[in-house]
Amino acid sequence: MNIMDSSPLLASVMKQNAHCGELKYDFSCELYRMSTFSTFPVNVPVSERRLARAGFYYTGVQDKVKCFSCGLVLDNWQPGDNAMEKHKQVYPSCSFVQNMLSLNNLGLSTHSAFSPLVASNLSPSLRSMTLSPSFEQVGYFSGSFSSFPRDPVTTRAAEDLSHLRSKLQNPSMSTEEARLRTSHAWPLMCLWPAEVAKAGLDDLGTADKVACVNCGVKLSNWEPKDNAMSEHRRHFPNCPFVENLMRDQPSFNVSNVTMQTHEARVKTFINWPTRIPVQPEQLADAGFYYVGRNDDVKCFCCDGGLRCWESGDDPWIEHAKWFPRCEYLLRVKGGEFVSQVQARFPHLLWNSSCTTSDKPVDENMDPIIHFEPGESPSEDAIMMNTPVVKAALEMGFSRRLIKQTVQSKILATEENYKTVNDLVSELLTAEDEKREEEKERQFEEVASDDLSLIRKNRMALFQRLTSVLPILGSLLSAKVITELEHDVIKQTTQTPSQARELIDTVLVKGNAAASIFRNCLKDFDPVLYKDLFVEKSMKYVPTEDVSGLPMEEQLRRLQEERTCKVCMDKEVSIVFIPCGHLVVCKECAPSLRKCPICRGTIKGTVRTFLS
């Protein structure tokens, strides 16, 4: 397989740099090895980058990889496998492994330098990655940590070149335009020269090494998803260039002030699912923090949310793709980067509503309609082919869910969604509701027959249940109900009212309460137990008219009926739709997906004000 056919990145590099031609078939180049993994199975539990870093390239067969140096072929990768350790264990005499071990041993000290003697013992491909021996007191930095990594070859090298400051502070390099002119032979396409120059860095003309014209820091070994300004600021936050740039730039409004710092955002990823192929550091760099659910993240500045991360996703590109007007994005990456990303996705250019601060699409503008194969210009087709809906489809939401959500919107308001943000927000809510309904459905499938019988004969039990207190005590002993709930029901004076409160409480508490109810009823009321759980036949006889009761008794019963069946404290005020039950207060209602009395799905609620 020709690398030029499978890697546009390397193809661009080759066109710009004639001296890179030798890398076309050079498996000793990690970048080339990485490009061979374009068709690597996605379900393999070892990352392509770690395999390439360990000297392997993809053979194109299942998950088989081969070392460019010793020819070792490995496959059948398992969770927890370490590519380099496995390489070292199976073929310890491999020259590539030996060279890497030598570099690791050198990288253990806090301050180290590669002497000419050591560097001469390395292979040419590795020697080209080492630091120049003329630079002493070299430190290596990884991510946002100040610790020193074991693998300096594959980690960003950050060198203190303060002793060369007079040379680097050449007035001719003081402008961004001048620094950009030095990048005519810049070897990387994953990092734009304009971005490097904007970060105050000057191309030194050797590999991918750059130096700050102000503080003297030298950075190299750039990785595909690095950001020049972020790396400059992270490793040397006290650099005068960085400080002046941040101070001179006007402040901007942010959605979440507590997530402004990189450190704060990183801390939110403590429970980030390990199966997600995008690393927290990358997401935090791009302004995102973890919301604690699935793989959902949000930008601290524009409040834009992204999810469903896949292997190869670049957080910065996704940020620019969906939220191009984010002020943080524009400040860090620049307008040129955003424009280039948007140009790659022309179908998003119409969308002036990609961020939460954007204005709705002009109602008077004719939408751009693209019909799918087999679709006709029907109302449904037009509804599903608006730019906003197209963007939601591109984000990975199911077409069926989008159609249901849009139809509900049109039925309720007689208009379609005008912004992507509004539609995505509703889709996320709809997905949450579907997940909850699925959980409820599974719960219903395993729900006991006891609970079903109690619910079915609820009204008849109100009339016939007399052994309320023993059952109430058993529920309290089993910690199925709280002392407050116990006391509220116990203080109810009339047995029918106590029975009503008890039965509704059992229905709310679920299977555990139903099981205790059954066992107690068997001991204290065998006749009722037989009718309910054995014969399964109970008849409800409408009660007498309460209008003839004393006013005090009527008020007491009314008060009992008005008590929330969940918290047993506040007054009921929410009617569930469509079942019509009025059994909970406004504080308890939001947590319920199904009516605690009939188990019907709650499609809507109506706030009531009882007088």
Curated annotation (Swiss-Prot):
What Pfam families does the record point to?
BIR, CARD, UBA_BIRC2-3, zf-C3HC4_3
- Name the domain of life: Eukaryota
Q: Where in the cell is it found?
A: Nucleus; Cytoplasm
- Annotated gene: ITA
Q: Which PANTHER family match?
A: BACULOVIRAL IAP REPEAT-CONTAINING PROTEIN 2, INHIBITOR OF APOPTOSIS
**BIR repeat residue numbers:** 30-97, 176-242, 262-329
Organism lineage string: Eukaryota, Metazoa, Chordata, Craniata, Vertebrata
Protein name according to UniProt? Inhibitor of apoptosis protein
Zn fingers (RING-type): where?
A: 564-599
| Stretches of the chain forming a coiled coil according to its record | none
Could you tell me which CDD domains the record lists for this protein? Answer: BIR (cd00022), CARD_BIRC2_BIRC3 (cd08329), RING-HC_BIRC2_3_7 (cd16713), UBA_BIRC2_3 (cd14394)
